[in-house]
């Protein structure tokens, strides 16, 4: 009788032990997946930084266009005084927009690297790694954001030499570069999504060119939104670049940060949405 009782207790405890074992294995598996994802993310960042260190020509050549925007367009339009800028010199007014245009140019064409890696088979080998596609997309987007910030750091001293007066507040300047980093990472994720749709480099280049300039002109980068036609004003309100320009202009030029919370919220929402969409579509890149 006592033996049967002990056996029954053992039978009851056995499932509990098995459940605890399965639960521990599950937690261990999740921990390994998370660690793999973090390693993959940092591996992507390290890969891009190595590329940047070994080939800086691309960064310097892409800095030429924004420098021309400031040096030629900015100085000429400053003499015309045709655009109301709220008392801010015109070259100062457009500097945040030019910085963002140059960084977004880097980010939007980041997907071209993805297309090339797919064509050469490199991407397929990278995707064999156990890390999640979310880690891959976020890692690559962070790396692209770093490249974009390096691009902006080249243009920044040139703007100072051209007479642009920045707010002498290191916290504001660092926050402005954080905005550049966040919006650039978001556009890099958008570029990865586009790369999953466009199967050739030629198609990707065409769509990239068609994306950058309309976004640039349909924002407050060169002129206030109130100067736009009503239909274009609605587009500008939905344009994430508008909020990034407003944030950087307030932090670097005017010192007005009253809209910073709204601007940052809009940028973060944009980043979250495009990260999710890009991660979902990333596996289709190798199909």
Predicted regions: what is each one?
Residues 31, 54-57, 103-108, 139-140, ...:
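Short alpha-helical transmembrane interface motifs in multi-pass membrane proteins
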Residues 43, 47-51, 121-128, 196-199, ...:
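Short amphipathic alpha-helical coupling elements at transmembrane boundaries
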Residues 51, 82-86, 216-273:
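Membrane-interfacial helix-loop-helix junctions in multi-pass membrane proteins
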Residues 73-82, 159-171, 198-200, 223-228, ...:
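Short helix-capping/hinge motifs at transmembrane helix termini and TM-loop junctions
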Residues 29-65:
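Aromatic- and glycine-rich beta-strand/loop motifs that create alpha-glucan
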Residues 68-75, 90-162, 182-183, 187, ...:
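Hydrophobic alpha-helical transmembrane segments of multi-pass membrane transport proteins
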Residues 280-287:
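Short cytosolic juxtamembrane segments of multi-pass membrane proteins
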Residues 133, 137-208, 213, 255-279:
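Alpha-helical transmembrane segments and their short interhelical loops
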